[in-house]
Amino acid sequence: MKINLDPMPDRTTEEIQSLVEKQIEKIDTSITAGLRTFLIQPRLETRDWGWSEPIRAFPVWIIAESKRYDYCLLYSDYGFGPANPWGLGFSSYKGFDADYCWYGSLEDAYKDSRLIEEYDEQKK
């Protein structure tokens, strides 16, 4: 998997919201109903890229969060982005996580997340 640690232009909250909405437009509405319950106003954090010496920190956007668990969906142009900019992560963990936690689309990240199970639990 290709990685990007080169400087990228800074993004705004509005740009990230727009990226999220463009991804949602591509997803079947039966899936987006659940996804939308977890979306938040994108929040910028800095997370450590632990596979370099010295360890470097890069911007990561939290775009969705669990209401019950330490779990979130992420977006970043760094690390495994831009090819796989949508990630699964723990809200309390400040690293990028492994390559298998990053996806080419928001849909794939959401489908592989525990958020789907949490949404199903909420409906019961």
What is the role of each PLM region?
Residues T37-P82:
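Amphipathic, interaction-prone secondary-structure segments
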Residues Q17-D48:
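Short, well-structured hydrophobic secondary-structure segments
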Residues M1-I24:
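N-terminal trafficking/processing presequences and adjacent post-cleavage segments
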Residues P7, R11-E14, R36, G50, ...:
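Short, well-ordered helical secondary-structure segments
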Residues K26-D28, T32-G34, P82-K124:
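Polybasic, proline/glycine-rich intrinsically disordered low-complexity segments
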Residues K2-I3, R43, G87:
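A broadly tuned "polar low-complexity/structure-edge" signature
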